[in-house]
A protein has these predicted regions:
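Short, structured surface patches at the beginning of a domain
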Residues: 1-144
Length: 144
């Protein structure tokens, strides 16, 4: 399986990304602390962090751009988040980020939810699986 090949053949280098639309900085701090603690418990390597205190409706977010830049440059091959909603609650916005990860053979790891199930119930897993099959790539999520 392509997904297994990434995790077996290449050491995961994760970028921890937190996002909240709350105006309280403590929400982002708590979210990031949770991500880093989970990474430590699972012996995952975190190569960088970024965060956004904004809505997830747009891709024009500095923290998300930093995470994508790290993936694009090969500094990271995965993004660590609490749940898919941290990318976006909107289908098309989340799909664009996941397609970006797929195009760069990178994965998404969710610490608070089962990414595969969450993507399935949001209707995102099937188009990504079909895209992976047609392009010979990977599905952009990893089981915890």
């Amino acid at each position: 399986m392509h997904q297994q090949q990434l995790t077996d053949e290449h050491k995961l280098k994760l970028w921890a990304y937190a996002r909240s639309s709350s105006s309280r900085p403590s929400v982002l701090i708590q979210q990031m602390q949770g991500l880093l603690a989970d990474a430590e418990r699972n012996h995952w390597t975190v190569v960088g962090t970024s965060q956004d205190m904004s809505t997830g409706r747009t891709l024009a977010r500095m923290g998300l751009r930093e995470a994508q830049s790290a993936v694009r440059q090969g500094l990271a091959n995965g993004i660590l988040i609490e749940d898919v909603g941290r990318l976006s609650h909107e289908y098309s916005t989340a799909l664009r980020v996941l397609e970006f990860l797929q195009d760069h053979s990178a994965v998404l790891i969710c610490t608070q939810t089962d990414a595969r199930y969450e993507l399935y119930i949001k209707g995102l897993s099937q188009p990504l699986q079909q895209r992976a099959m047609s392009k010979g790539g990977i599905v952009p999520w990893r089981e915890r």
